[in-house]
């Protein structure tokens, strides 16, 4: 009876050892590398962690606007000022343009206007015409409640000026900060306002071409055709304008 127990115990130990070897072998490859799912997930997580993250850089320094110049001036034009990262103007002044050109990007910033204020943010502008707005699409900045341009949604806040309308009741009242995001990726463009996508269109498409031909831009044959250009801020309207937290993320 004691011998039977001993053999049974030995068989149990051997069975357990063999099972352990089989389990260990299933987890280990020829080079001792794990072949189970969990380590593969860890590798994927590590790869994701090593992947390049979106890099945003500021276009407005805290106390200077060294990345900007006037449309007609090599320096910051009279009437514009920079204070603690906010660039502002009061009255009619020269337009601002970046010193650097941009092709594909996401741009985000906050802006506010005084009562009845009117301005715009231009993208992919060139210098072939007398003004940037004859070459560059424009994200309209407007006090919809009081500015005459709001009579048409084609020229209201966040519209692609003169071509694609933006809906009403998204922009905040004057003297309040609005949040804007603009995506320009190849031919694809998106206008966002206060967390809502309000305009989306394709540059150079048949629809876009037809709209340009029906607009005042038809007199400027290269309007909107540039694939790379300057970002501009319109200054030639009266009233106050302020922008802050302007950052850009360049796309491939």
Predicted region positions:
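Positively charged n-region of N-terminal signal peptides that target proteins for export
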Residues: 1-7
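Carbohydrate-interacting regions of secretory-pathway proteins
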Residues: 21-252
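Bacterial N-terminal signal peptides
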Residues: 8-19
């Amino acid at each position: 009876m004691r011998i039977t127990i001993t053999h049974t115990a030995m068989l149990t130990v051997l069975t357990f050892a063999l099972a352990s070897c089989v389990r260990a072998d299933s987890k280990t490859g020829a080079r001792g590398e794990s072949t189970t799912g969990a380590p593969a997930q860890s590798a994927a997580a590590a790869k994701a962690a090593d992947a390049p993250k979106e890099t945003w850089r500021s276009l407005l320094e805290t106390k200077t606007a060294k990345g900007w110049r006037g449309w007609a001036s090599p320096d910051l034009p009279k009437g514009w000022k920079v204070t603690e990262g906010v660039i502002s103007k009061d009255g009619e002044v020269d337009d601002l343009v970046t010193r650097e050109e941009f092709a594909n990007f996401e741009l985000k910033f906050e802006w506010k206007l005084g009562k009845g204020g009117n301005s715009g943010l231009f993208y992919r502008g060139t210098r072939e015409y007398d003004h940037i707005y004859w070459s560059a699409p424009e994200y309209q900045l407007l006090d919809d409640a009081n500015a005459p341009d709001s009579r048409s949604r084609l020229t209201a806040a966040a519209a692609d000026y003169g071509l694609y309308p933006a809906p009403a009741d998204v922009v905040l009242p004057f003297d309040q900060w609005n949040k804007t995001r603009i995506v320009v990726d190849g031919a694809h463009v998106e206008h966002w306002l206060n967390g809502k996508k309000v305009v989306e269109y394709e540059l150079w498409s048949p629809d876009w071409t037809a709209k340009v031909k029906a607009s005042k831009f038809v007199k400027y044959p290269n309007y909107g055709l540039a694939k790379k250009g300057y970002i501009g801020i319109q200054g030639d309207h009266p009233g106050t304008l302020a922008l802050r937290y302007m950052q850009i993320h360049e796309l491939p």
